[in-house]
């Protein structure tokens, strides 16, 4: 069993989570999420631009145990939010927040099941996370790193107001080949 969270981190989480939108609930993962989580992360079209190729239930369970022990907004940690459809309780995907620079910056990432892509759920979830980070937690800068071939994520980030800051050429050896990535960023002063 994971050790209890420090009081300050537990209180911070209680004040901020879950996040709700008109259609979504963004919350900590639960054990009942793991079969759906493992299933969509194991799909080739989902894993294509991610660091994994296969995502087993064993890996999903290890992920869950690691996430249970994390405090919300713990510096230098990736905190994953489950994205639940309020209407039916289905797990649509997840949004990751990499808290950096003692709460001044964060890197964002997202993974969604193909069944819930192209319906505005990722945009809605990202807007909720951006509002949390900029408006409630007063972050200065948000970033996202994306494979240059991931046109869906690029379109989403640009639609949310992120601007491309860098093109890293062959900066990552990824699934047997050198790959390019874009760095996107958004400052609080640019946030709408």
Language-model segments: which ranges?
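Acyl-donor (CoA/ACP) binding surface of acyl/acetyltransferases
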Residues: 2-48, 80-192
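Hydrophobic residues in alpha-helical segments
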Residues: 41, 50, 71-73
């Amino acid at each position: 069993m994971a050790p209890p969270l420090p009081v300050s981190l537990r209180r911070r989480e209680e004040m901020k989570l879950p996040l709700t939108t008109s259609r979504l609930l963004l919350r900590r993962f639960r054990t009942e999420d793991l079969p759906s989580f493992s299933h969509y992360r194991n799909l080739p079209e989902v894993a294509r631009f991610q660091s994994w190729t296969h995502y087993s239930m064993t890996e999903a369970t290890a992920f869950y145990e690691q996430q249970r022990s994390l405090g919300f907004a713990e510096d230098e940690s990736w905190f994953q939010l489950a994205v639940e459809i309020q209407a039916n309780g289905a797990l649509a995907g997840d949004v990751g927040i990499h808290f950096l620079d003692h709460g001044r910056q964060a890197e964002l990432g997202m993974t969604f099941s193909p069944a819930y892509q192209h319906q505005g759920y990722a945009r809605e979830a990202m807007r909720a996370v951006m509002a949390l980070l900029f408006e409630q937690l007063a972050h200065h800068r948000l970033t996202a790193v994306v494979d240059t071939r991931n046109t869906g994520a690029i379109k989403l980030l640009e639609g949310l107001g992120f601007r491309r800051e860098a093109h890293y050429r062959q900066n990552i050896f990824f699934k047997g080949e050198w790959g390019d990535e874009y760095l996107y960023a958004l400052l609080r002063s640019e946030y709408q």
